[in-house]
């Protein structure tokens, strides 16, 4: 299981922007392949996504520099090494880059290589990827957080909150959960049409109409859930990704569609009112990534009622997560492999969260590819929750379809209402 060659190429992501794909060829001829996603709403402390900045190609968004790093330095450094030791490979990649944020080689170049090595190992063992990724955690089929109404940086509309998600916690298994979400998605389309609202979809496949308020979005979802024949609060609950860093300006949070602005305390009260009105069980990035005093207040006031997920706050970085744990900030972390740049560091963040009673939510990015690695990692890590968009666009459904295949192969329990236990 030794590496013969590593080769990368420039491909397109779901937004039509270049990204990187890497092939790791073993001496046996087996090829492991992985491609890297890209975010629109990004944390300031994410690992560096290396772009060419050449205005003559792809408006500066090309990734040929990252491709060359894989084909040259990375290929030379890893040739002859075994894919059996993922931590060693990732350590060498980080040492080769030798920067805090992977800005020399690019986190996109490093991650494509890291994930492709893991996939090559699974293929060489003739085992499913989720099996070879598992490190002894109790594996479960995750509850999907289905982003069926889009706003913020993920849509060209006037909605402030970035993601309105449904979670089918009442389903008996993953296939039924997917069915429930899909049926609600299609009913929602008819509800929007009936009210004369736009049914075009955003980056993650959710509908992106112009609506009057965040409450109206939740009311539309509630209507669709009931018309689809499901019980709100029992079969289906809500999750929000506020992406509050995108709303934060000069010390205030601006809800432009509602013509309101809030300080941290007022926004926490706003969330408390929403939680009392709707079955919201999770709020992601409820405050700005730098507003740690506000996050402390948020966690104190609402942390015993809902899951408070740090995305831009923690950027899948074990060092930053450790600081948050020490200060009692949030109670869950979003896991995005490209925020940190290697599989091993992603696993470290997951383990650190588990060891300190924090939950983990596996996540895609708004600029995705057909790669389904995160579906296997969600199952392997036993995180119990996954964000991978709405119920349309192949870049989103590819992950759901991979979870269906895993469910067919393995007799694993569906996380369901267990995610609500505290």
From Swiss-Prot:
(2R)-2-phosphoglycerate binds at residues 163, 365-366, 387. One of its GO terms (biological process) is glycolytic process. Keywords: Cytoplasm, Glycolysis, Lyase, Magnesium, Metal-binding, Secreted. GO terms for molecular function: magnesium ion binding; phosphopyruvate hydratase activity. Pathway: Carbohydrate degradation; glycolysis; pyruvate from D-glyceraldehyde 3-phosphate: step 4/5. Gene3D superfamilies: Enolase-like C-terminal domain, Enolase-like, N-terminal domain. Pfam families: Enolase_C, Enolase_N. The active site is at residues 204, 336. It is found in: Cytoplasm; Secreted; Cell surface. GO terms for cellular component: cell surface; extracellular region; phosphopyruvate hydratase complex. Mg(2+) 2 binds at residues 41, 241, 284, 311. Binds a second Mg(2+) ion via substrate during catalysis. It catalyses: (2R)-2-phosphoglycerate = phosphoenolpyruvate + H2O. It is an enzyme of class 4 (lyase). Its main location: cytoplasm. Its EC number is 4.2.1.11. InterPro entries: Enolase (IPR000941), Enolase-like_C_sf (IPR036849), Enolase-like_N (IPR029017), Enolase_C (IPR020810), Enolase_CS (IPR020809), Enolase_N (IPR020811). PROSITE patterns: ENOLASE. Its cofactor is Mg(2+). Belongs to the enolase family. Catalyzes the reversible conversion of 2-phosphoglycerate (2-PG) into phosphoenolpyruvate (PEP). It is essential for the degradation of carbohydrates via glycolysis. Homodimer. Component of the RNA degradosome, a multiprotein complex involved in RNA processing and mRNA degradation. HAMAP family: Enolase. This is Enolase. It comes from Legionella pneumophila subsp. pneumophila (strain Philadelphia 1 / ATCC 33152 / DSM 7513).
């Amino acid at each position: 299981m030794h590496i013969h060659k590593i080769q990368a190429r420039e491909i397109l992501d779901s937004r039509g922007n270049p990204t990187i794909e890497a092939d790791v060829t073993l001496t046996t001829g087996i090829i492991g392949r992985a491609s890297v996603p890209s975010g629109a709403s990004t944390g300031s402390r994410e690992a560096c996504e290396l772009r060419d900045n050449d205005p003559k190609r792809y408006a500066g968004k090309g990734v040929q520099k990252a491709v060359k790093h894989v084909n040259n330095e990375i290929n030379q450094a890893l040739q002859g090494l075994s894919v059996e030791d993922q931590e060693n490979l990732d350590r060498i990649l980080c040492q080769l880059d030798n920067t805090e944020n992977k800005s020399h080689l690019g986190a996109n170049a490093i991650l494509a290589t890291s994930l492709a090595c893991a996939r090559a190992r699974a293929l060489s063992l003739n085992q499913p990827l989720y099996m070879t990724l598992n490190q002894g955690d109790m594996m479960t089929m995750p509850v999907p957080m289905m982003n069926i109404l889009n706003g913020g940086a993920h849509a060209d509309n006037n909605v402030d909150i970035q993601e309105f998600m449904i979670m089918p916690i009442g389903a008996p298994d993953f296939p039924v959960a997917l069915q429930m979400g899909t049926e609600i998605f299609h009913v929602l389309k008819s509800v929007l049409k009936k009210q004369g609202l736009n049914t075009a979809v955003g980056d993650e496949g959710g509908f992106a109409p112009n609506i009057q308020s965040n409450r109206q979005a939740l009311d539309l979802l509630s209507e669709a859930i009931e018309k689809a024949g499901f019980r709100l609060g029992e079969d289906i609950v809500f999750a929000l990704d506020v992406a509050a860093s995108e709303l934060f300006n000069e010390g205030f949070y601006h809800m432009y569609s509602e013509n309101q602005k809030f300080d941290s305390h007022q926004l926490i009260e706003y969330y408390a009112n929403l939680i009392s009105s709707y079955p919201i069980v999770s709020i992601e990035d409820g405050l700005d990534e730098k507003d740690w005093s506000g996050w402390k207040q948020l966690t104190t006031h609402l942390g015993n009622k809902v899951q408070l997920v740090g995305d831009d706050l923690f950027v899948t970085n074990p060092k930053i997560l450790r600081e948050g744990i020490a200060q009692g900030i949030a109670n869950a972390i979003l896991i995005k492999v490209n925020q940190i740049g290697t599989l091993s560091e992603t696993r470290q963040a997951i383990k650190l969260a588990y060891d300190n009673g924090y939950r983990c939510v596996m996540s895609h990015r708004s600029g995705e590819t057909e790669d389904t690695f995160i579906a296997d990692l969600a199952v392997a890590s036993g995180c119990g929750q996954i964000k991978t968009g709405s119920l349309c666009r192949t870049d989103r459904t590819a992950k759901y379809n991979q979870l269906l295949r895993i469910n067919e192969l393995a007799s694993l329990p569906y996380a369901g209402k267990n995610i609500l236990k505290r």
